[in-house]
Regions:
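Conserved beta-sheet core of the metallophosphoesterase superfamily
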Residues: 1-95, 128
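Long, low-complexity serine/threonine/glycine- and acidic-rich segments characteristic of extracellular
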Residues: 88-190
Length: 190
C-alpha cells in the first residue's frame, strides 16, 4: 500500500508497520511529498528574482512524478529550476590536514532518500565504496543559510522556517589513508 500527503514543506518516506497499527502483510509506504513553493517562497532571491525556497529539510523546492505499473510504483523527485540529475547535496571540507582525516565526516542529503536507500561514497574513482549511515539530523547548509539570512540587517525577504531533523541525511568518515593532494568524493544512492 502507498499513500501521499503534502503541505508539510519537507520530503519524507515513512514505512508504517504492525508496531504502528498497520495490519497489512507488507509495510505501508507513506510519502510526505515536496512542495513546489518549498518553504512558502521564503529566503534570499536568486538571480531571477525568485526566493530560493529551500525547505526546512535542506531539499530544494520541486515536484515528484509517480508512475504505476499494477501494484508496482516509482517516485522521481525533480528540483525546480535544476537539472534532473540534481538529487543530493554533499558536505565535505575543502581542505583537511592529514592529521584531521581521522575525524572528518562526509555528509550527504539525499532528497528522495528513505530508510530503504543504500548510500555509499568513495574517494577518487578508483577507491572502494564505503557504506554511509543514515542519520536524522539538521541539514548544515540550510542551518547556515538561515543564520546568514537572518543576520542581514536590510533583508527584503521573509525568513526561512525553523530547522528540521531530516531522516534523509547520510554520513561516513573520510578514509584516513589518503595521500596529500586533491581528491574527488563520489556518492551513489540506490
Amino acid at each position: 500500500a502507498v499513500s501521499v500527503s503534502a503541505h508539510t514543506h519537507y520530503m519524507e518516506h515513512r514505512f508504517i508497520g504492525a508496531e504502528d497499527g498497520w495490519r497489512g502483510k507488507q509495510k505501508h509506504h507513506h510519502i510526505v511529498n515536496v512542495t513546489v513553493c518549498g518553504s512558502w517562497w521564503r529566503g534570499r532571491k536568486n538571480e531571477r528574482g525568485i526566493p530560493h525556497a529551500t525547505m526546512k529539510d535542506g531539499a530544494p523546492n520541486g515536484y515528484s512524478v509517480m508512475e504505476f505499473d499494477g501494484a508496482e510504483y516509482s517516485l522521481d523527485f525533480y528540483a525546480a529550476g535544476r537539472p534532473a540529475e540534481y538529487q543530493m547535496n554533499i558536505y565535505a571540507p575543502e581542505v583537511v590536514a592529514q592529521s584531521e582525516l581521522i575525524k572528518t565526516v562526509i555528509l550527504a542529503n539525499i532528497f528522495n532518500g528513505s530508510e530503504r536507500s543504500q548510500v555509499a561514497m568513495r574517494v577518487d574513482d578508483q577507491g572502494e565504496w564505503i557504506p554511509m549511515q543514515q542519520a536524522s539530523m539538521v541539514d548544515p547548509a540550510f542551518r547556515d543559510e538561515k543564520l546568514r539570512e537572518e543576520a542581514e540587517p536590510n533583508r527584503t525577504w521573509t525568513n526561512l522556517p525553523s530547522v528540521y531533523h531530516t531522516p534523509h541525511m547520510w554520513r561516513a568518515m573520510m578514509p584516513t589513508k589518503l595521500k596529500q593532494g586533491t581528491h574527488v568524493i563520489e556518492i551513489r544512492a540506490q
